[in-house]
């Protein structure tokens, strides 16, 4: 499982701990463990073509919302799309919002209409 460390920020899952996104390719999901191992935030995706993924759903438990956790998941998923030279269909409203707020060329050129 690949891990991508992110800078610690106020409101991180545990104060002083960086947000660490884990990528489980077999389950096709990105996760952030919260409160030890008890809770987790997740971003789900599926392959819908040979080189096309659908970024389907992002979920952060209510108690952890507003802390930037979904942003880390979205960035990790889009970075994966870029690194693997994939195309992305974005079903998830949050990832659509993330791309709109972060219109980086490397993300925009990979999006399917």
From Swiss-Prot:
The N-acetyltransferase domain, residue ranges: 22-112
Which stretches does UniProt call biased (Low complexity)? 1-16
Q: What is this protein called?
A: Protein NATD1
* Gene that encodes it: NATD1
Tell me which InterPro entries the record gives.
Acyl_CoA_acyltransferase, Gcn5-rel_NAT, GNAT_YJDJ
Organism field: Bos taurus
| Region of interest (Disordered), residue spans | 1-20
Q: Which family does it belong to?
A: Belongs to the NATD1 family.
This protein's superkingdom? Eukaryota
């Amino acid at each position: 499982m690949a891990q991508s460390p992110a800078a610690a920020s106020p409101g991180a899952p545990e104060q002083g701990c960086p947000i660490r996104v884990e990528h489980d390719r077999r389950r096709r999901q990105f996760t952030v463990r919260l409160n030890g191992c008890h809770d987790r935030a997740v971003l789900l995706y599926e392959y819908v073509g040979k080189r096309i993924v659908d970024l389907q759903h992002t979920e952060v438990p209510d108690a952890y919302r507003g802390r930037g956790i979904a942003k880390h998941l979205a960035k990790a998923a889009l970075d994966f799309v870029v690194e693997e030279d994939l195309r992305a269909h974005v079903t998830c409203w949050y990832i659509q919002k993330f791309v709109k707020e972060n219109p980086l060329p490397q993300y925009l050129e990979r999006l399917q209409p």
